[in-house]
Curated annotation (Swiss-Prot):
InterPro entries: FAD/NAD-bd_sf, FAD/NAD-binding_dom, Fd--NADP_Rdtase_type_2, Ferredoxin-NADP_redctase_2. Its cofactor is FAD. It is an enzyme of class 1 (oxidoreductase). Keywords: FAD, Flavoprotein, NADP, Oxidoreductase. GO terms for molecular function: ferredoxin-NADP+ reductase activity; flavin adenine dinucleotide binding; NADP binding. It holds the Pfam family Pyr_redox_2. The keyword Kinase does not apply. The lineage of its organism: Bacteria, Pseudomonadati, Pseudomonadota, Alphaproteobacteria, Hyphomicrobiales. Homodimer. Its EC number is 1.18.1.2. This is Ferredoxin--NADP reductase. The keyword NADP applies. It catalyses: 2 reduced [2Fe-2S]-[ferredoxin] + NADP(+) + H(+) = 2 oxidized [2Fe-2S]-[ferredoxin] + NADPH. It comes from Rhodopseudomonas palustris (strain ATCC BAA-98 / CGA009). It comes from the Bacteria.
Amino acid sequence: MTETIKTDVLIVGAGPCGLFAVFELGLLDVKAHLVDILDKVGGQCAELYPEKPIYDIPGIPMVTGHGLTEALMEQIKPFNPTFHLSEMVENVEKIGDPGFRVTTNAGKVFECTVLVVAAGGGSFLPKRPPVPGVEAYEGTSVHYAVRKMEDFRGKDILIVGGGDSALDWTLNLNPIAKSMTLVHRRDDFRGAPHSVEQMRQLVASGKLDLKIGQITELQGDNGQLTGATVKLNDNTTSQIKCDAMLPFFGLTMKLGPVANWGLDLENNLIPVDTGTFETNVPGIFAIGDINTYPGKLKLILSGFHEGALMAQKAVKYVYPDKRVVFQYTTSSTNLQKKLGVN
């Protein structure tokens, strides 16, 4: 018989918003478990851009996705959350008012008072470039994300795409690459203007080879790339030497089982009350990129704000008879004791 795990709050998603929600809930003596489909904490920060700089976290001029994840994990240590990784929530059943029985694809069963959906954009899959045989090189020399920059040191790197990700990694990897080629289908880039300007400066200085066209063929053996053929826009072809390829064609987002949980949806996002970030189902909240409301900004700092307000409503479900007094960590000896700093 499967053992039922009982917790005050179950958080679906262990990205930055889910992690910070643990902190805000912990200050209110609310215990949390987290479930994430990934095999690591950090969400998109850990999976897609662990070494990419983030510049808009308040008070931190620059931090990488990995660095932010590590800092959040350190911050929530006092509250000892339990993580259930490589699992996906498949079913949510209402058993109380509020109260939910939640089942994962691994057969794990939770009973929680409050359910928090912090699943980002749902599950995300990189769009595969339309190049015959590309799948034979995936995971060895074709990569859809940069997890360790050092893995690309001294390599002949081919980057394909014209958006922010393609430009950012062109700029970040260029100093450690043996050679670098950027291929885009047109000489018009969708990335930030300052990134486009920096990229063109690299081209002018001979540090980057820019090809305007499309990849038509890959060469290599046993999963290892040795080169690629580009059909240029003037109908000529160009041969590129490369042993690592990074295609950035965007992501396909899939909401997954969340769509079957009885929640109102709007363009695959969950509408919420902006005072509490509660959904149409009492006791189920949505924070981070998964939710929508007028003026919504898909920023990590917005998700932190949403998690703080969510916790203030969630605690009333967990402790309906308890009078909750708002406290500041700067002055409350009670909160400081919980954090282990007093």
